[in-house]
Structure formats: structure tokens, C-alpha cells
Swiss-Prot record:
Protein name in UniProt: U2 small nuclear ribonucleoprotein A'
Subcellular location as annotated: Nucleus
Taxonomic lineage of the native organism: Eukaryota, Fungi, Dikarya, Ascomycota, Pezizomycotina
Gene3D superfamilies listed in its UniProt record: Ribonuclease Inhibitor
GO MF, any single term: U2 snRNA binding
UniProt KW keywords: Leucine-rich repeat, mRNA processing, mRNA splicing, Nucleus, Repeat, Spliceosome
Domain of life according to the entry: Eukaryota
InterPro entries per the UniProt record, alphabetical: Leu-rich_rpt, LRR_dom_sf, RU2A
PANTHER family registered for this protein in UniProt: U2 SMALL NUCLEAR RIBONUCLEOPROTEIN A (PTHR10552:SF6)
């Protein structure tokens, strides 16, 4: 189900236990974040139990303090998200698909992030995962529900150095990123490799979704249709008709 203006307007908005104004968008199988401009100002958004692949495409939202995104399919955090949500304090990304330590670099650009949850992501199995996150995010006080210790911060500095003078280990880690489509950087890449086919190779899709998208591109019979597909890919979302019909039938 797409995150339409109607879905947003019909969703429950309430004060949560932290006295934050929260909107409930749980469990709709939303494939991509869009149309949040119609939601109005909120302190917290609950996207738990959806199919979101890219965390991004937020309008400027300085009021947002909490994002709940457990049990999605997130493999990438858009590079522009810290600019859109500069006051984010609590981020829950448990049970997603983040794979490499370098994919977490963007988290270091949230100046007020204090509570971070990444449990049950493949990246948590990487060597030095916890130290890496604490090195990137010195302001984080609770990581995966465990309070950060000063000794851990010191160990992180020993392993990875400083931001200005990173160790060889830090440089090596920074060079290994998942092969996913970077929405935020797409406009800077110029014309080369910017067509739908190259975006398809970098957007993290299932095999069925890839085939459906390839079919849509082949069947596009107008410039307007091609532009529509290009726009959807640039925004990191699946064009209508990509979600496997078999999956919808199973739900019924």
C-alpha cells in the first residue's frame, strides 16, 4: 500500500507516553516514504511493520524527535536525512537489512541522536560493530538498549582514531558499502549511469520486483511514462504495480 495523503490523513495521531505528538503508520506494507508534507508537524512517527527499503524522502521536519522503523526492509539511510530531521533523538531500526558498517556513516551526522537501536540487522554481526557506531556517534548514550560506557568510547578511539585522522582500519571500513541506490547522491552523478536500468541495478529489490520493473520500462510507450518511472526510482520508491501480486493474494 502506498503512503498516500489519504492514508496519512486517516491515521491515528495522539500523544505518546513521552508527551510527543505521534502519528501511527504501522503495518500497512508501505514500500516507500512519501507525501509526509501533508502529515503536519509531529514529534514522532511510527513506521513499524512495513516494507520500507530506503529511510529518507522526508520534508524539512525540525520537530521530529523519534522515528520507529522496526521490522521493515531498510538497507540504506538517505544521505540527506540528517538535514531534514536535525533534531532526531531516538531512532529504532531493529530487524532491517542494513549490511555494512560503512552504511551507518550517515548516523554520525545527527547531532542530537542519543538512543539508537540496530538489533537484528546483518551489520550487528560485523567485527567491532558496537565500537564503530560509538566512534561515528559519540553523542549516543544508549545503543541497542544498553547504556554506553566511557571505556567503550575510549576503545573506539583506539581502534578508529579521530574524524580528522582515522586509522587504517577506519579507512578500510569506510570503503566497504552495500551496493544500494543512493537517492541523495543521484542528482550529483550527472547523466552517466542515471537511467532507469542503472538505478534498477542499485535499488535493493527482490527478483520478482526487478522483473516487473524491467517489464514496465520495456512497455513504457511515452516520454511521460518514462519520466514517471524515473521519478519514482530517484525518490527511492517502487512505482505502482511492482509489488508482487502473489504477495497480495497471500494476504487475502
Amino acid at each position: 500500500m502506498r503512503l498516500t495523503a489519504d492514508l496519512i490523513n486517516n491515521s491515528l495521531s495522539y500523544l505518546n507516553p513521552l508527551k510527543e505528538r505521534e502519528i501511527d503508520l504501522r503495518g500497512h506494507r508501505i514500500p516507500a516514504i512519501e507525501n509526509l508534507g501533508v502529515a503536519g508537524p509531529h514529534d514522532a512517527i511510527d513506521f513499524t511493520d512495513n516494507d520500507i527499503q530506503v529511510l529518507g524522502n522526508f520534508p524539512l521536519s525540525p520537530r521530529i524527535r523519534t522515528l520507529l522503523l522496526a521490522r521493515n526492509r531498510i538497507a540504506q539511510i538517505q544521505s540527506t536525512l540528517p538535514n531534514a530531521t536535525p533534531n532526531l533523538k531516538n531512532l529504532v531500526l531493529a530487524s532491517n537489512n542494513i549490511g555494512e558498517l560503512a552504511d551507518l556513516e550517515v548516523l554520525g551526522r545527527f547531532p542530537r541522536l542519543t538512543h539508537l537501536v540496530l538489533t537484528d540487522n546483518p551489520v550487528t554481526k560485523k567485527e567491532n560493530y558496537r565500537y564503530w557506531v560509538l566512534w561515528l556517534c559519540p553523542q549516543v548514550r544508549f545503543l541497542d538498549y544498553v547504556k554506553v560506557k566511557d571505556a567503550e568510547r575510549q576503545k573506539a578511539k583506539e581502534l578508529f582514531g579521530t574524524a580528522d585522522e582515522p586509522t587504517e582500519l577506519a579507512k578500510t571500513i569506510k570503503g566497504i558499502k552495500s551496493k544500494t541506490f543512493d537517492v541523495g547522491a543521484s542528482s550529483a552523478n550527472g547523466a552517466a549511469g542515471s537511467g532507469p536500468s542503472s538505478k534498477l541495478s542499485r535499488l535493493k529489490l527482490t527478483e520478482k520486483e526487478k522483473k516487473k520493473l524491467q517489464d514496465l520500462i520495456k512497455k513504457a510507450d511515452s516520454l511521460e511514462e518514462i519520466i514517471r518511472l524515473e521519478k519514482a526510482l530517484n525518490e527511492g520508491r517502487l512505482p505502482p504495480g511492482i509489488i508482487a501480486e502473489d504477495d497480495d493474494a497471500m494476504e487475502e
